[in-house]
Amino acid sequence: SEDQQWANYRINETPSKGVMMWGKMTNQYNQLSMGYNSDSNIERMGYDAHGFTGKRVMGYAESHDEERLMYKNLTYGQSSNPSHNIKNLKVALSRMSAVGAVSLLVPGPKMIWQLGDLGWEKSIFTCANGTVNTDNDATNGDCKLSTKPQPQWVDNWLGDDNRNKIYNDWAKMIELKTTEPI
């Protein structure tokens, strides 16, 4: 494919000249984090699933253009099991450590979007007044580019055991990935 040609271009030169490709996996990772089996195959997070010789896929579960995993966990997450209701903040946050385990440890570079490692749960369509307004809502426009509330600083998210656990779990996985051959 054309992507393979770009990624593998002059791969044996030092430095190699190949192009890094984006590996959007938002829907698949969100299905996993929400507790659903459908459309949850994360195989394409790795470069080898694309047929690339080098680690040329910048895989990610979240970005500036995609809805936050935590927002969808709390809004649409599996809630049929009362002892593991993903719409519960503590349960939803616990699932983010698992997202790190099955994304960060895949060989190749990864992108972590702002505060995903602390379980940011506000929609990307959150307005300055705290409401959520997407381009699909009855009111014209959306708030995707609005200034977002910043509770992580005033509420000391690193002092919150549930959020700090995600941060520390992800840090351990990144350290493992960078110090051990995976």
PLM region descriptions:
Residues 1-61, 66, 79-83, 91-110, ...:
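Active-site-proximal helices and loops of the catalytic beta/alpha 8
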Residues 68-71:
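Short, solvent-exposed loop/turn elements at domain surfaces
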Residues 76:
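Gly/Pro-rich active-site loop or hairpin
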